[in-house]
């Protein structure tokens, strides 16, 4: 049920997996600062 910080998939909308991270809409996953 839990998701990994780097590999928690996300969408254009707020996602619990990206609580402390940034959802990279370019790649579709959660990253630390969006530069990935």
UniProtKB/Swiss-Prot annotation:
Tissues of expression: Expressed by the venom gland.
Gene Ontology CC: extracellular region
Pfam families given in the database record: Toxin_12
Compartments (UniProt record): Secreted
Residue(s) carrying Phenylalanine amide: 36
Statement: the UniProt record of this protein carries the keyword Ribosomal protein: no
GO molecular function: ion channel inhibitor activity; potassium channel regulator activity; toxin activity
Domain of life: Eukaryota
Cysteine disulfide partners in this protein: 3-18, 10-23, 17-30
Signal peptide: none
Residue spans crossing the bilayer: none
Record keywords, A-Z: Amidation, Disulfide bond, Ion channel impairing toxin, Knottin, Pharmaceutical, Potassium channel impairing toxin, Secreted, Toxin, Voltage-gated potassium channel impairing toxin
This protein's domain notes: The presence of a 'disulfide through disulfide knot' structurally defines this protein as a knottin.
Miscellaneous comment in the UniProt entry for this protein: Weakly inhibits Nav1.5/SCN5A (IC(50)=2565), and Kv11.1/KCNH2/ERG1 (IC(50)=8197 nM).
Function recorded in the entry: Inhibitor of voltage-gated potassium and sodium channels. Among other potassium channels, it selectively inhibits Kv10.1/KCNH1/EAG1 (IC(50)=236 nM) by shifting the voltage dependence of channel activation in a depolarising direction, it shows a maximum inhibition of 80% at saturating concentrations, it shows fast on-rates, and is poorly reversible. It also slightly affects channel inactivation, when the membrane is highly depolarised (>+80 mV). It shows similar potency on Nav1.7/SCN9A (IC(50)=222 nM) and lower potency on Nav1.2/SCN2A (IC(50)=519 nM).
UniProt family annotation: Belongs to the neurotoxin 10 (Hwtx-1) family.
Record protein name field: Mu/kappa-theraphotoxin-Ap1a
């Amino acid at each position: 049920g839990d998701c990994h910080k780097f590999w928690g998939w996300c969408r254009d909308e707020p996602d619990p997996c990206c609580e402390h991270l940034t959802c990279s809409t370019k790649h579709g996953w959660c990253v630390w600062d969006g530069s990935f």
